[in-house]
Amino acid sequence: MIEASKLKAGMTFEAEGKLIRVLEASHHKPGKGNTIMRMKLRDVRTGSTFDTTYRPDETFEQAIIETVPAQYLYKMDDTAYFMNTDTYDQYEIPVANVEQELLYILENSDVKIQFYGSEVIGVTVPTTVELTVAETQPSIKGATVTGSGKPATLETGLVVNVPDFIEAGQKLIINTAEGTYVSRA
């Protein structure tokens, strides 16, 4: 059992017959009354997200999640296809369940598939990835790192804020936890 006050982003637990992943969690102390936990959660099976609050002392059954190394193969219609790199088993995951993760991976990228029992529930991407800039405003001569930056669309469709000197076609290192530019590759 785990208390609501100990839940952090990325953890998975069971509540009301649902398998739920924490996307965001924060303590909130209203002016009057007891502390509450505000959380943004995702139902792992359906992919739907919702906001809720819990008392810090509420307890939940923590889900035991196993991970296996895998490779992203391709996406067709509403399904993403992955292959276990140890056993070569292939897995189909609804795009709604891995929509955010697909913004950070290309075909043949290495990932980790998450299992709850024998059920595939999600994908973990590396902490940083290398992606190419597909489209951005032209760079400004004399631009420095200290500028406010500009939006750039990457090859996966992800939009990140980058320094003014970045041009289309350049490879960038992206932090997948925050969805931010780290450096040029």
Swiss-Prot record:
Superkingdom, taxonomy of origin: Bacteria
GO cellular component terms attached to this protein's record: cytoplasm
Protein biosynthesis recorded as keyword: yes
Pathway assigned to this chain's UniProt record: Protein biosynthesis; polypeptide chain elongation
UniProt record, GO biological process: peptide biosynthetic process
Record key words, sorted: Cytoplasm, Elongation factor, Protein biosynthesis
One Pfam family linked to the record: Elong-fact-P_C
Main location: cytoplasm
CDD domains on file: S1_EF-P_repeat_1 (cd04470), S1_EF-P_repeat_2 (cd05794)
SMART domains: EFP, Elong-fact-P_C
Gene Ontology molecular function: translation elongation factor activity
Subcellular location: Cytoplasm
Gene3D superfamilies: 2.30.30.30, Nucleic acid-binding proteins
HAMAP family with a match to the protein in the record: EF_P
Protein name, UniProt field: Elongation factor P
Organism per entry: Streptococcus pyogenes serotype M4 (strain MGAS10750)
Gene: efp
